[in-house]
């Protein structure tokens, strides 16, 4: 089996981002982004998706977290698009429900080649620590646009904002794991009746 890994580097006047991923990893994460709460959430993707992540970002954090969060999402999306390759033999779809105490979230993903985000998370607070939770919309939009996936994110219940966000990221990791899994019955076959994605 060919290695499903990718390295992507993205440099702008606002951020310099490097992302390495291994879709068939063990859930290891090495994160140096400068935004601790985002790092905590990305660690959930690695751990629950069994995807190795190595992400380094130098951003204009003296302004705010916006460019860093968005550009990490963009670059991670580019890395996923590269790592899945032609998608032959891949499950393609993934979904997960994850609870954390009172919170429950559902994430559904399709590596369709068509970007689309539906995100419905009624945050109960605007900020967790120093982190503006609205930036997670920017993260996921950047990811979707560059991974070329359809992504549906729903927080079904919860009143602790940290729990709401954490269930989203854990479910996202688990949905990714399911979607990128290789099915030996589909070896060499495209997971679409169109013959391409």
UniProtKB/Swiss-Prot annotation:
Family annotation (InterPro entries): IGPD_sf (IPR038494), ImidazoleglycerolP_deHydtase (IPR000807), ImidazoleglycerP_deHydtase_CS (IPR020565), Ribosomal_Su5_D2-typ_SF (IPR020568)
EC primary class: lyase
Record pathway: Amino-acid biosynthesis; L-histidine biosynthesis; L-histidine from 5-phospho-alpha-D-ribose 1-diphosphate: step 6/9
Keywords for the protein's UniProt record, in alphabetical order: Amino-acid biosynthesis, Cytoplasm, Histidine biosynthesis, Lyase
The protein's name: Imidazoleglycerol-phosphate dehydratase
Family membership noted in the UniProt record: Belongs to the imidazoleglycerol-phosphate dehydratase family.
GO MF terms held by the record: imidazoleglycerol-phosphate dehydratase activity
Catalysed reactions, as listed in the record: D-erythro-1-(imidazol-4-yl)glycerol 3-phosphate = 3-(imidazol-4-yl)-2-oxopropyl phosphate + H2O
Cellular compartments annotated: Cytoplasm
Pfam families per record: IGPD
Principal location class: cytoplasm
NCBIfam families: PRK00951.1-1 (NF002106), PRK00951.1-5 (NF002109), PRK00951.2-1 (NF002111), PRK00951.2-4 (NF002114)
GO biological process terms held by the UniProt record: L-histidine biosynthetic process
PROSITE patterns per record: IGP_DEHYDRATASE_1, IGP_DEHYDRATASE_2
GO cellular component: cytoplasm
EC number: 4.2.1.19
């Amino acid at each position: 089996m060919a290695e499903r890994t990718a390295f992507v580097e993205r440099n702008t006047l606002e951020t310099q981002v490097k992302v390495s991923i291994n879709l068939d990893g063990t859930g290891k994460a090495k994160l140096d982004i400068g935004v601790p709460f985002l790092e905590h959430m990305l660690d959930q993707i690695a751990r629950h998706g069994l995807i190795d992540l190595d992400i380094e970002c130098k951003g204009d954090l003296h302004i705010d977290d916006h460019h860093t969060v968005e550009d990490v999402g963009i670059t991670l999306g580019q890395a996923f698009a590269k790592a899945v390759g032609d998608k032959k033999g891949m499950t393609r779809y993934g979904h997960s429900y994850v609870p954390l105490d009172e919170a429950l979230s559902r994430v559904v993903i399709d590596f369709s080649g068509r970007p689309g985000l539906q995100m419905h998370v009624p945050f109960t607070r605007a900020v967790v620590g120093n982190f503006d939770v609205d930036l997670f919309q920017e993260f996921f939009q950047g990811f979707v646009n560059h991974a070329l996936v359809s992504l549906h994110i729903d927080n079904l219940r919860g009143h602790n904002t940290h729990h709401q966000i954490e269930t989203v990221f854990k479910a996202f990791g688990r949905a990714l794991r399911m979607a990128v899994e290789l099915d030996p019955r589909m070896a060499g076959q495209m997971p679409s009746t169109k013959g391409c994605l």
